[in-house]
Amino acid sequence: MDVNEIRENAKKLMELMMLDKPFVAVKLAKSKEEIPEGYETLDEEKRHCEMIQMARLERKKLYATVDKHLCKGGAYAMGVFRNPPEPLATGKLYVKLGNFKDEEAAKKTVDAIPKVEEEIYATVYAPLDETDFIPDSIVFIGEPLYALRLVQAILYHKGGRFQADFSGIQSLCADAVAAVYTRKAPNMTLGCNGSRKYAGIKPEEVVVAFPPEKLKDIVEAIEHFRQVWTCGH
């Protein structure tokens, strides 16, 4: 699927699901040359989850190298931030933040978080229906009913069970991007304290992410659902 097909399918999916906010395309660029022309960088540091919201709510096209990533935990999970400080790598940071009872519980969780092993130059963001690149992950943020339809659409062609893997930390970065990138499989997550506080993920919103290879099948499934169910409202 090329960029034009992705854009067309993204527009069609928004119409079918009656969404007023776009899906977000996220790319892990390994070099400066992979960043599309005209994409802006930030004047100040921001979190990855905030940048996703900029693409989703403001239709911004942007990218961020490590120096523009305010949340180093997210940058670490996505391969942008290398050699993290010991409190982040061991999970001690999350004990301090109150997420875990002790360092053992924190380390067990941090060790299990999906991480991109390759060195990534920058993260790149765009509304999916206006993207200029093939994304590594397509991110949806919205109400559970819409997430349900996406999960049903993902399973429509081949069946099975949807495996959601998350731990309540590093949700938009590790769960929605690193997991999809490394496993080439969809994932679902509930957001984390940081993304809900700083990026404005609403209490009634959840997150579904999937690789671009799933997009066409999802559109076909939603088209079918529209014929037999009320999809969305």
Curated annotation (Swiss-Prot):
Quote the Pfam families the UniProt record gives.
DUF169 (PF02596)
Top-rank taxon:
Archaea
- Name the InterPro entries for this protein: DUF169
Q: What is this protein called?
A: Uncharacterized protein MJ0308
